[in-house]
Amino acid sequence: MAEAHQAVAFQFTVTPEGVDFQLSREVLKHIYLSVIRSWKKRLIRIKNGILRGVYPGSPTSWLVVVMATAGSSYYNVDISMGLVYYIQRWLPEGRPYRTPYTRTLFSMAIFSTGVWMMGIFFFRQTLKLLLSYHGWMFELHGQTSHLTRVWAVCVRLLSGRRPMLYSFQTSLPKLPVPSVPATVHRYLESVEHLLDDEQYYRMETLAKEFEEKTAPRLQKYLVLKSWWATNYVSDWWEEYVYLRGRNPIVVNSNYYVMDLVLVKNTDVQAARLGNAVHAMITYRRKLDREEIKPVMALGLVPMCSYQMERMFNTTRIPGKDTDVLQHLPDSRHVAVYHKGRFFKVWLYEGSRLLKPRDLEMQFQRILDDPSPPQPGEERLAALTAGGRVEWAQARQAFFSSGKNKAALDAIERAAFFVALDEESHHYDPEDEASLSLYGKALLHGNCYNRWFDKSFTLISFKNGQLGLNTEHAWADAPIIGHLWEFVLGTDSFHLGYTETGHCLGKPNPVLPPPQRLQWDIPKQCQAVIESSYQVAKALADDVELYCFQFLPFGKGLIKKCRTSPDAFVQIALQLAHFRDRGKFCLTYEASMTRMFREGRTETVRSCTRESTAFVQAMVQGRHLNEDLQRLFRKAAEKHQNMYRLAMTGAGIDRHLFCLYVVSKYLGVESPFLAEVLSEPWRLSTSQIAQFQIRMFDPNKYPKHLGAGGGFGPVADDGYGVSYMIAGENTIFFHVSSKFSSSETNAQRFGNQIRQALLDIANLFQVPKADG
């Protein structure tokens, strides 16, 4: 389609007089504008680096200190206690210090700058110390202590005004290393009710032997690492949990995010995509300029923002032993897949970001292009869905030179990947299966219409519905959720559409069309592609996904029960699982540790002794409501306490994981660690964050709700459950399992979740919403 329009900076022809160069003014103009844009970005980064480096100080505060020093000198008050005079003596003779007056001014400026820098250092260290206090998390709602109130005032005073995205990074405390006895004790407490007496005695013996003999040496190395590393967990977690995994990342690692499902802005596929891509690049520009406000817990405690750095221009590159994340400082295009063809779409005209209407025109050109796929091109992306070793070998053998390398570079160096699907998906409340089919399309598609290695793939369906498929190694779900909230809010409330559903404005018809990527894929490579496709297809076909909207109530009713919404849902999941399987199991709930620098996640083992006691009492059906309420509140309090411990660095699993990594480096065998890390998570759960950005008033626009997202089951005979408490009156659930397991059924478990929520709510006899 676009071969004839490929831009070249110059052409040359051989004549009798020699070689005649013909420079293209248009291309040189674009090169010039590109250089200008690149330098502008560098200058912005330098400026932001300086402002970030002196935060919470500012040029204004520096000027105040200088003026205070000069003013005191005017009134013959030496607040420097002779230091200004001492500095003046050491200034070299001659220019620019020729007169005593200029020497004095320079001395005052140097002294003031030193005082200013010392103040910044003091404020930062004090703020870091204050942010290490987590007592506020363990206080009952509405019962704030005097200590916490004083702490909050101090944090607010030291946090400065108008912080940039990364302003607090150096003030965040490091993730603390828990003590081995505390971790072992909490671990044994988490499994005691899941094991019989003989199994528990055996595990207790292994734990005691580990604690006394093996752990002290491992702990010393781990503490040593925590001293010099920014975070003692995150780099190993990224490498060993994600990048060293050799299994396919589709279903096993990548997750999906859904669009708004109760409102629709347009049915025009290219228009919706044009607005979304424009909003994403606008977000990237804000990200580069650090104009995005850091996420603050309670509007007071900053969360770590480092994961956002690799949101765009990032690709997971396969390797034989381990993958690597390739992140580029900038990218001016997106890669697009449609009907088996790959395209390169430029996002800028010179230094100007294309308007939504221009982007709509470019995507419509791709939709209208009738050209067929090249041999081997249609299913090429299946390589990213198959085994990692096979992909690494194929990449080295067939994509390391020539046009294949150039085309692959265009994809891997893109800002992100776009999939233009030919089918339609949406949520129809009257059709229960519609949400599940939508989720399946986002999770794996047809296994070759997503580039699973990109940081994220933006998926556009024929009816204008959108969604994301996200690679997991570079960041966790709240990070991509932050971007998605911005995109959906910008699309609905800032960009808008015409009455006919197109983007606002007029397109620029002289824009060169998208560039078709060229491939030369030999038969041997096509065989590898087909093999990877069959592997991925078997995985995808085995996934049973059941997504549903729970309408009877949401967090509004749960709050009336005077309990945490997350604890309420987690206990309901335990009740549902016991009814479904007739037994309890290790349960994984993801929590975050972003109150610490470069923190990612920690595990909450939410199947507790207290929750099992409540479930057993519910199932027996012989207890009074008052007794059941008491057991429920006890279970909810235990869950909340465990969640708080995980968030404040006192979790179990990341500590044991790191001790295991140290043991492998040292060649030390630990039966206890080997057994703990091989235990299957048959119920893996996660709550989806929302309203991280206030783009609109949810009370005024209650139907502007996304349905969250989901992931595949972690264990072959287990369930994966994600949920989003989407408002006062609704909860979305995404339940996954495998068809190949005779013990699990996603829809059956989803129905058990529904009933468990209703049964627990009935204990409190609180009226439910209609629906």
Swiss-Prot record:
Keywords: Acyltransferase, Fatty acid metabolism, Lipid metabolism, Membrane, Mitochondrion, Mitochondrion outer membrane, Transferase, Transmembrane, Transmembrane helix, Transport. Coiled coil: none annotated. The active site is at residue 472. Residues 1-47, 122-771 are cytoplasmic. It catalyses: (R)-carnitine + hexadecanoyl-CoA = O-hexadecanoyl-(R)-carnitine + CoA. The keyword Methyltransferase does not apply. It is found in: Mitochondrion outer membrane. GO terms for biological process: carnitine metabolic process; fatty acid beta-oxidation; fatty acid metabolic process; long-chain fatty acid transport; response to blue light. Residues 74-101 are mitochondrial intermembrane. The keyword Transferase applies. The chain crosses the membrane at residues 48-73, 102-121. It is an enzyme of class 2 (transferase). It is a multi-pass membrane protein. GO terms for molecular function: carnitine O-palmitoyltransferase activity. Pathway: Lipid metabolism; fatty acid beta-oxidation. (R)-carnitine binds at residues 588, 601. One of its GO terms (cellular component) is mitochondrion. CoA binds at residues 554-566. Its EC number is 2.3.1.21. Belongs to the carnitine/choline acetyltransferase family. Catalyzes the transfer of the acyl group of long-chain fatty acid-CoA conjugates onto carnitine, an essential step for the mitochondrial uptake of long-chain fatty acids and their subsequent beta-oxidation in the mitochondrion. This is Carnitine O-palmitoyltransferase 1, muscle isoform. It comes from Bos taurus. The gene is CPT1B.
